[in-house]
Amino acid sequence: MPSVSSSAANGSQDVALSVRDLVKTFLVGGGVFGGEKGEVSAVAGVSFEIGAGRTLGLVGESGCGKSTTARSILRLIEPTSGEVVLTRPLDGGGSERIDVIAADRRQLRELRRHMQIVFQDPFASLNPRMSVGTAIGELLHVHTNLTRKERSDRVGELLSLVGMNPNVADRYPHEFSGGQRQRIGVARALALNPGFLILDEPVSALDVSIQAQVLNLLEELQDRLGLTYLFIAHDLAVVRHICDDTAVMYLGKIVEQASTDRLFTAPMHPYT
């Protein structure tokens, strides 16, 4: 594993995620007629840190690069350059800082245990032909040696954790409301006990009353499990409610970052 450094004492490392000069460019042009190719910088040198157990909001209008940043951090798409350092706990105590971008395929598979994502549209991210119990247990099947009975028990625990009856595990995504499906998405993301979650517009597709319920659930889970969140959104009211710190993104760059209270009361950048 491409370790950056390690700490022998629990809690001595208080930065859960450090992103430095993250760049993602896409080739454009060419096409069937062989026109001139160019590059578009969707993410142009983004840097930030998230303290352990805290929530950083990443805000900006559609197309500014928020979701591309998230997917680059997890390497769901490959970043062009930069550094993403994740702090993960070590067996027996202490912690280790891992360069996600430098990890090979096997190492990245191991890192998936420690970082997960909850998508905006839970229906699109759930296989309609797969029961929710199977969908939640899929990661357990791939990444653990649990027996079928142990996986089933764990799925029940996860459903209970997000406020759902374990008996619904045999039902299918279309049988649930949008808010329930998002709870299922959260349960699946928590299956491997990750310490870091990216929440990519997790409530934007929900009614306002359901938004509040899901946001309260996310806060409860953070307090209970010590989770660290990168919360991507365009709704400033939601960000103000849940985020400790906020970074404002514009045209692929972060133009301002501060505590959420300071940013909302005394913004410094004109775009903010």
Predicted segments, located by residue:
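Hydrophobic anchor residue at the start of the ABC signature
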Residues: I136, V186, I210, V214
